[in-house]
């Protein structure tokens, strides 16, 4: 069954709270002059004239964007004139996107503009003073809250509105639109204009006529003046920022840091926790930062990156997160990223800029730290001032989103291999137990914890009991107030097929909705997210994959179609609503059958001691004990052989490397089977020139004229790295000498020490993995218990139903994150069943050919597939999922008893 793995999006920053009903501007001291534009405006080829749209005063940035007029707007004021009551800054529209899927083109939007490019282009970046007041006569206007469709409230007068240089009026936690990217200064300038050949022809004739009349030369002169003004202002902006950075280096005072914040980001003050974290980092103190989703955690490493002399290395779990964070770097910070999704030439270019000192912030995945060549650059020449561990809860096996690759992010490695001077660990959701584990691993003192409330107070939380008609219940909810008036809604599901099914159902009922999950092509995911951000889509029905890089502050509601897997997941996902500070609504549909199904799936990563023992025996086999031999484990075949998921095998191998005893050293994962075809020179000729080619000929077998060989075996035979072998055959390919294909993805490692007792090590690992499995189940039980309590409390108080449920859930969330998450939570799973053992006995007798373990039988009875017992085969038996309501451990115990009896009976029959 397809479902998306949990992922955090806590780096996504949010708009600071705004007043619900902003005022109209005060009196205008001196009216602005209307000046004809300098630049030419394209006209339609149609002979019919259209009425012009009426002129309006400058809009309030917090007000909802108006519906574009079908008529062309009036000519905008020229940017050459400086006597306007405000300045117009060129900014990129939120709806700007590229519809391509390639990594390089996705990343191209994230690139920054250098000073030299500013000087040559002159239009990519228009720096302006950060704050300019707009003065206008007082006027009472109707305003709509950004997250509502309709509203009828008249705005009372308040203080003057301030325009910021980022051009969008939002707070400093959603969009840093100073990256110098080319965009339209007037987005609707050419709207409605014909793009036909005749239109361009007419424009060209008109321009030539003006040149003939002497007007063309005047226009060119004025455009040249505009170019010079832009260059001067850009140089002035950069000079001001450099002065502010120098002032902070001299004295990291609150005043100097706030001035730098204002210049680069355009905001007057820091949010709670930001300034404290920045000052600790600049002081060289490793810090643990826990801020709510959307509270601006990324700013806490961006400002230090400007000040500190070395590189800031940001470790992030997903490529999509890295691309988003790179895209939102301000133009003054030069950034880059390294990912396995890049083409070789892209990675080479990034490494070149890194070595030349061009890049200040580098985004990498934790797997990159396995690359010996990458680490050697930092040991030899590059200086790392700060290592940022984003989504730091992934370090802890007790978190809701444990990732084995994060286990290698230990302070000892970061300080020794990268020579890091300071560590910043960031997360939005972490319990006390998780924080202790993360801070211990990264050696962050307990006094260096900055933790703010993990739940904002502008939510109305609610839960309802649902069943087979959940889709109908969802439709009824969305067609009732206040949801029917909310402009942007996210609906979270657990399974990929649900997103497509529910979004289609909503569209059939005239609700503009789209499904989103990790199985969609990258370009489709980008298009859906950007359409949602620009309000072209009202509802996104998504798995937990949605939310990374979400740049939208006015999401008005989050609806959970199923119970989340943990409190952390729930808080993280509802945190994507209400980032503009307005009241937002979060509803959860609780269904007991779905809860039991998710509880069964929580056991899918568990393993038996027998399977762990077989796995360790293979890892430490006689063939692998040779000194410095590069060993490999083909993932697909090993997964079926040991009935383990890829993630579980990776967890065990990582623990063998980073545990109390280092038994092995992990190497980069790669496709180990290479099929090589020689084209120009003969194999023997190339072998005479290259030791690697000679080793390939010795270690390969010829099949239909093709040489098939194992890359680790070739590398071990001549004592070189696997990357050297790959580099050699790639170089031959570039010369046209060979072509090759790679297959069989495998874990690669080198044995450093063999365990004395496999059984003892197997028992230790099984106990550790069982605790992780139990922790996952317990988190689901706690979330389920909180939802049920909120349902039951709705009829026991004089408060309104919404207020009662909100208080109940808030109380549970507070207790969970500030207490011990190991607190007992009753499970709804049945602890015994009269017919269970009888059915297991029948099941074993009817499937004598299979080799079962107690866990394999329990999974089948719960309707959960595994690598050795896939859904496609075993879902056909009538025992599949029959005992989903019975506790998994109870079934395992019954299965173990029946397996012993079954073996004894077979042995007796054999004798």
Curated annotation (Swiss-Prot):
Domain Helicase ATP-binding: 278-448
Induction trigger: Repressed by drought.
GO cellular component: nucleus
Motif residue range(s): DEAH box: 390-393
Region (Disordered): 1-84
GO biological process: cellular response to water deprivation; DNA recombination
Limits of the Helicase C-terminal domain: 470-628
Gene: RECQL5
Main location: nucleus
Family, similarity comment: Belongs to the helicase family. RecQ subfamily.
Keywords assigned: ATP-binding, DNA-binding, Helicase, Hydrolase, Isomerase, Nucleotide-binding, Nucleus
Protein name: ATP-dependent DNA helicase Q-like 5
Tissue note: Mostly expressed in roots, seedlings, shoots, shoot apical mersitem, flowers, and siliques.
Binding site for ATP: 291-298
Biased composition (Low complexity): 20-48
Subcellular localization: Nucleus
GO MF terms held by the record: ATP binding; ATP hydrolysis activity; DNA binding; helicase activity
Regions of compositional bias (Pro residues) in chain numbering: 54-79
InterPro entries: DEAD/DEAH_box_helicase_dom (IPR011545), DNA/RNA_helicase_DEAH_CS (IPR002464), DNA_helicase_ATP-dep_RecQ (IPR004589), Helicase_ATP-bd (IPR014001), Helicase_C-like (IPR001650), P-loop_NTPase (IPR027417)
EC numbers on record: 5.6.2.4
Domain of life: Eukaryota
Catalyzed chemical reaction(s): Couples ATP hydrolysis with the unwinding of duplex DNA by translocating in the 3'-5' direction; ATP + H2O = ADP + phosphate + H(+)
């Amino acid at each position: 069954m397809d479902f998306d793995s949990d992922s955090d999006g806590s780096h996504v920053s949010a708009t600071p709270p705004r007043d619900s009903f902003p005022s109209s501007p005060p009196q205008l001291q001196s009216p602005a002059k209307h000046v004809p534009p300098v630049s030419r405006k394209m006209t339609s080829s149609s002979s019919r004239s259209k009425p012009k749209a009426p002129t309006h005063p400058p809009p309030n940035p917090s007000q909802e964007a108006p519906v574009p007029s079908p008529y062309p707007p009036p000519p905008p004021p020229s940017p050459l004139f400086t006597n306007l009551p405000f300045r117009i800054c060129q900014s990129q529209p939120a709806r700007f996107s590229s519809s391509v899927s390639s990594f390089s083109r996705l990343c191209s939007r994230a690139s920054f503009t250098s000073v030299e490019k500013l000087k040559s282009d002159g239009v990519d970046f228009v720096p302006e003073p950060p704050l300019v007041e707009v003065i206008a006569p007082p006027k009472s206007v109707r305003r709509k809250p950004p997250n509502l469709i309709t509203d009828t409230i008249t705005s009372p007068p308040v203080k003057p509105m301030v325009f910021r240089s980022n051009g969008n009026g939002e707070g400093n936690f959603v969009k840093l639109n100073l990256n110098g990217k080319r965009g339209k200064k007037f987005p609707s300038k050419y709207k409605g204009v014909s793009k036909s050949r005749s239109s361009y022809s007419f424009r060209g004739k008109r321009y030539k006529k003006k040149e003939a009349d002497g007007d063309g030369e005047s226009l060119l002169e004025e455009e040249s003046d505009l170019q010079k003004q832009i260059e001067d202002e850009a140089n002035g902006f950069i000079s001001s920022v450099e002065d502010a950075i120098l002032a902070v280096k001299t004295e990291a005072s609150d005043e100097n840091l706030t001035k730098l914040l204002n210049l680069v980001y355009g905001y007057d003050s820091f949010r709670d926790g930001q300034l404290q974290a920045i000052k600790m980092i600049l002081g060289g103190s490793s810090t643990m930062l826990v801020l709510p989703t959307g509270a601006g955690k990324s700013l806490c490493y961006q400002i230090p990156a400007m000040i500190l002399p070395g590189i800031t290395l940001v470790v992030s779990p997903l490529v999509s997160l890295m691309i988003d964070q790179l895209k939102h770097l301000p133009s003054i910070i030069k950034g880059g990223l390294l990912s396995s999704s890049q083409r070789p030439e892209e990675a080479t270019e990034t490494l070149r800029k890194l070595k030349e000192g061009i890049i200040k912030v580098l985004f990498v995945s934790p797997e990159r730290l396995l690359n010996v060549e990458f680490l050697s650059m930092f040991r030899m020449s590059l200086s790392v001032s700060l290592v940022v561990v984003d989504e730091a809860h992934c370090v802890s096996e007790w978190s809701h989103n444990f990732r084995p690759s994060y286990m290698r992010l230990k302070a000892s490695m970061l300080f020794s291999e990268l020579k890091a001077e300071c560590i910043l660990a960031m997360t939005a959701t972490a319990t006390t137990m998780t924080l202790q584990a993360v801070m211990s691993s990264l050696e962050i003192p307990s006094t260096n914890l900055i933790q703010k409330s993990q739940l904002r107070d502008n939510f109305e939380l609610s839960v309802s009991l649902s069943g087979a008609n959940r889709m109908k219940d969802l439709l009824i909810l969305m067609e009732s107030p206040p949801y029917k008036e909310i402009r942007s809604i996210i609906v979270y599901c657990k399974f990929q097929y649900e997103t497509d099914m529910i979004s289609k159902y909503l569209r059939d009922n005239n609700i503009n909705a789209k499904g989103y999950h990790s199985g969609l092509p990258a370009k489709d995911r980008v298009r859906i997210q950007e359409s949602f951000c620009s309000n072209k889509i009202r509802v996104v029905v998504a798995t937990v994959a949605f939310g990374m890089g979400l740049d939208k502050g006015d999401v008005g509601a989050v609806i959970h179609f199923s119970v989340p897997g943990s409190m952390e997941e729930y808080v993280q996902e509802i945190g994507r609503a209400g980032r503009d500070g307005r009241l937002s609504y979060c509803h959860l549909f609780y269904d007991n059958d779905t809860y039991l199904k998710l509880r069964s799936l929580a056991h899918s990563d568990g393993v038996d001691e027998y399977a762990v023992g077989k796995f360790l025996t293979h890892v430490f086999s006689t063939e692998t004990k040779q000194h410095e031999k590069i060993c490999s484990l083909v993932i697909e075949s090993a997964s079926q052989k040991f009935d383990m998921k890829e993630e579980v095998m990776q967890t065990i191998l990582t623990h063998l490397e980073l545990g109390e005893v280092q038994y092995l050293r992990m190497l980069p994962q790669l496709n180990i089977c290479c099929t090589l075809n020689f084209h120009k020179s003969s194999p023997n000729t190339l072998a005479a020139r290259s030791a690697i080619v000679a080793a390939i000929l010795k270690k390969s077998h010829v099949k239909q004229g093709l040489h098939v060989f194992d890359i680790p075996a070739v590398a071990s035979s001549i004592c070189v790295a696997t990357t050297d072998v790959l580099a050699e055959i790639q170089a031959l390919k570039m010369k046209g000498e060979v072509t090759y294909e790679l297959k069989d993805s495998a874990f690669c490692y080198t044995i450093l020490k063999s365990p004395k007792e496999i059984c003892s090590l197997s028992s230790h690992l099984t106990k550790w993995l069982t605790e992780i499995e139990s922790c996952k189940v317990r988190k689901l039980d706690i979330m389920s218990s909180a939802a049920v309590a909120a349902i039951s409390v709705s009829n026991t108080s004089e408060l309104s139903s919404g207020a009662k449920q909100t208080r109940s859930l808030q109380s549970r969330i507070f207790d969970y994150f500030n207490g011990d998450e190991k607190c007992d939570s009753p499970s709804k799973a049945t602890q015994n069943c009269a017919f269970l053992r009888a059915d297991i006995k029948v099941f074993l007798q009817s499937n004598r050919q299979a080799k079962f373990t107690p866990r394999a039988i329990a999974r089948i009875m719960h309707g959960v597939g595994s690598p050795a017992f896939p859904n496609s085969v075993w879902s056909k038996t009538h025992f599949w999922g029959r005992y989903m309501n019975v506790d998994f451990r109870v079934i395992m115990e019954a299965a173990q008893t029946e397996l012993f009896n079954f073996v004894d009976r077979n042995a007796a029959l054999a004798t």
